[in-house]
Every structure is written in structure tokens, then in C-alpha cells.
């Protein structure tokens, strides 16, 4: 039987526990989350336990990364279920601060990353990546783990985090973990719970569109021809709108046309009120 995860709610308590582990010579992995945990999140914890002696997960629904018309109010919050899931995954510590702990009165600092945060989700969700970068910077400095783990499903987010960690000399290894998928290929996401059964049946067309573009690139086609066809296909399949489908350089996220280097195909589309994102890599 797994031991129940220990829960702390203050930065001081988090630092005290991590400091005690450090005194024992133990290494620490951090998995930042917004809760509503699924198997994808738990795969990050399990990978963290392969890379370090102790695993810390944070659960904080970060208000600064939601736009004014987004789903902050209805984003699922289920701490008891999350704590049970983390316990079963072998996580040692859950950091679950409230908003006042993370953003005390007078808080006035924002971390913004130019370049990799431009375009894609950055164009559709202005301010989103500044909110992500600020809260993740805080979490990394609060915990100072040896390694922090993030899912590749949020590929642009991962690129933003890698960039600011490098630029700001934050001494933490940033580890990307491959996307976990449902049996029909849909990327696991806390927001999948928003979908009706009818929408859920349409959702796998997103990964099919991405794999179709990958096949086309391998056959020598250009992104400028493939991406508009994929958008049309998603709308025909029943998606309400497509924010973007783009082919980018896997490292820099600069726009790319042909398969002459490692690329990433990224998409965001909407089914009703649910916004789905996904991406896959393709190698020459």
C-alpha cells in the first residue's frame, strides 16, 4: 500500500521539507500542475522518480495564465482525488498553495519570454505565457529541484520554460516527457472532461490531422499546402473552429516549410467550449 502524500501549503514548509532532503543528500524532482490529474501527469511523477530520490508535485490553478474569457472559474479542482492519485504514483510531497501565498498583496513582477512565446497559443491567448513563465519561475525558485518535468503536449510552453530557465541561469534541468494518449490517440488533458460524448467522438481527428501532415512532409510536400487542407478536414469532421495548425522548427519554433530538419507540427482547435491542443514531432 502506498504512503499518503504529505501536503504543504506554504513556501516556508516546502523549503523546509526540501532542505531536510538535501541534508540527507537526496535529489529532488518537481512536477508543476494545475491539478485535475490524469495518467499523463502521473507519468511525469513516475519519470521524476526515475531521475531523482524524491518527487514533489505542485497543484495550483494559476489565475494569471487565464484570459478574461477563459475557463478559470470552471477549471476542475479536486484536491482529494489529486492527492490520492499522487500517493498511488509514489509522490512524496504535494505543494498546494492558495493565490495569496503565490501572489501576495503588492506582487508586481512578470516574467515574459519573447520569441518562442510569439505566435501559436501566444497569439490566441495574449498574456498566457507570461502567466506561465512567472508562476513556473516562482515554483522553480521556491523548490530548487534538481529536475523539473513538463509534458510535451504543451510543447510551446515547454519551449518557453526551457528558454527562461536558460536565460535566467536557473540551475534546474528541464525535462520534457512524451504525451500520453487515450486508446484512440487523443492526447490526455484535464479539459477533455468538458466534452460531450458527441464531441469526444470527433476529437481524435486532431491527431489524425497532425499525422496526415507528417506523412505529407515525409513525401516531400510543403507545409503551406498541407496545413490549410488539414484545417478544412477538421472543420468538415465537426470542429467548430481551428486556432492554428502550423509546422515549426522543433528547437526554435521558427516557421518551417519542408522536412529538412527535426520539425514539430502543432495545432489548437475548438469543439464547443473545449479548446484542444496537440503536437507531434517529425524527423527527416
Curated annotation (Swiss-Prot):
Keyword Repeat: no
Any single Pfam family the record assigns to this protein: Pantoate_ligase
Cell compartments where the protein resides: Cytoplasm
Pathway field: Cofactor biosynthesis; (R)-pantothenate biosynthesis; (R)-pantothenate from (R)-pantoate and beta-alanine: step 1/1
GO biological process: pantothenate biosynthetic process
Binding site for (R)-pantoate: 65, 157
InterPro entries per UniProt: Cyt_trans-like, Pantoate_ligase, Pantoate_ligase_C, Rossmann-like_a/b/a_fold
Binding site for ATP: 34-41, 151-154, 180, 188-191
EC annotation from Swiss-Prot or TrEMBL: 6.3.2.1
Residues at the catalytic site: 41 (proton donor)
Assigned GO CC terms: cytosol
EC category: ligase
A GO molecular function held by the record: ATP binding
Reactions the enzyme catalyzes: (R)-pantoate + beta-alanine + ATP = (R)-pantothenate + AMP + diphosphate + H(+)
Main location: cytoplasm
Domain of life: Bacteria
Keyword tags: ATP-binding, Cytoplasm, Ligase, Nucleotide-binding, Pantothenate biosynthesis
Extra facts: The reaction proceeds by a bi uni uni bi ping pong mechanism.
Entry function: Catalyzes the condensation of pantoate with beta-alanine in an ATP-dependent reaction via a pantoyl-adenylate intermediate.
Subunit text: Homodimer.
Family: Belongs to the pantothenate synthetase family.
This protein's name: Pantothenate synthetase
Organism: Paramagnetospirillum magneticum (strain ATCC 700264 / AMB-1) (Magnetospirillum magneticum)
Highest classification ranks of the organism: Bacteria, Pseudomonadati, Pseudomonadota, Alphaproteobacteria, Rhodospirillales
